[in-house]
Amino acid sequence: MAGLAATVIGLYGRLQESEKSSSAEKEQTFFLVILYVFLKSGKTMLQSLREAASRRRYIKHLSEVSSFLVRESERRTLADGLKQYVHPSREFTLLLGSLGEDLESGFGVVEKVEKLIEQAISRESDRWKRYVDSVETLGEVVVSVILLIPLIYVVGGLLGGFPLIYSVVIAIAAAAVLYVVSSASEPLHLVDLPRSITFISTAVIFVFGGVLATSLLGFMPVLLGVVAGVATLVWGLFVHFMYVRRAVAEGEASFLLLDGVAARLRAGYPLGRSLEAVADPRYKRYAMAIAHGLEINPYNRFMALAMETVKIARLGGLGAEALSLLARLALSIYLSFTGARARMKLYTALAIASGAAIIAVSAITLAPFTGLPQDVATEVQRLIAVPSIEPVLPLAMLVSYVLGVVVGRIEDQTIAACWRAGAGVLATLLVYSIASAFV
């Protein structure tokens, strides 16, 4: 028992370290941008770390690391604290160590951070490409496993019965693995919807997921499917058009804002008046908000950081060169993110069609048995138990629902993007209504 407890504790510790490492690598780009903005505005490294510690919206984990480094600077020099800090992410440990060495030697820390951002620009597309490749590989395995479920059900039924709950567990476990792995390996988290929307969406997903789970008991599966599908689809489309699309578009707007401000600074125009003169609708609202001191809450984290950067530039703390560098980073991130989303469109189609495919494969597999003459069918039923297609419907709806939620989270970076789940359930019901007429 003691050995098992030690193993569990050790495994939990490893999982925590892995989570910290993943979070650091995911937030590292934002961390570098925050340091760069405040270092270029004239603050010291210690002051810049204090600013980073207060930016939990962008760097939830690394803000805690920044706070720790600030506290450590009270016991020893900041350079020693940076050099001796050990993080589960080897890459982040080396980054802090190199900054500590430059700080100790008196070499340009600002130039080092600038160089690191240049490297981030060049590698951003590669990071997203590797991420999509890994998700696609795992996604193919998951889809293959899920599409085998109807065959397992039918063959198991012919051999004496295969409990449907096993199929449910297999499907949900496969989708859960895809969700966890994709979330952990995400290169950069950009979409940041209001907490209220995320909370309501989570409630919608669990409530109507529970409704579909109830249909496994054989209680009005068609009616429950229609209710869950329509409700999830309507709410998901509302979130998509009101929030997700804006969050994606703000990625381009962040580049336009930073690049436009940099161009005006190079031309010698007063920044405040230039912001008021912006006419491009893609980023006009953000420029006007900065110019008039209005509060606006972007749904894209880089857009929020870009607005904060322009506010600092308006106070005279940043030049055109710094803003141009950040504009190039914003463009690289936007193109990489939208490129990844475009490659994921196939999985949106697969998620929506997964339940329908399960129904179709089940119907095709059962067709040879249900199309027999009456006397032959009676004899076959006496020899083997031919399964029915009706019990497959709740399973197929639940699979399409879960996959729709997972794919929405991967493609749009938020669990609130649940319209695919509702569309999948309705597509499953449509195919079932057709298939049930033949088997």
Task: Tell where the protein language model's regions lie, with residue ranges.
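Intrinsic disorder/low-complexity segments
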Residues: 88-89
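Short, charged cytosolic
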Residues: 100-121, 315-329
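Membrane-helix interface and helix-disruption motif detector
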Residues: 157-166, 190-193, 213-224
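Residue-level signature of catalytic and energy-coupling elements of molecular machines
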Residues: 42, 113, 414
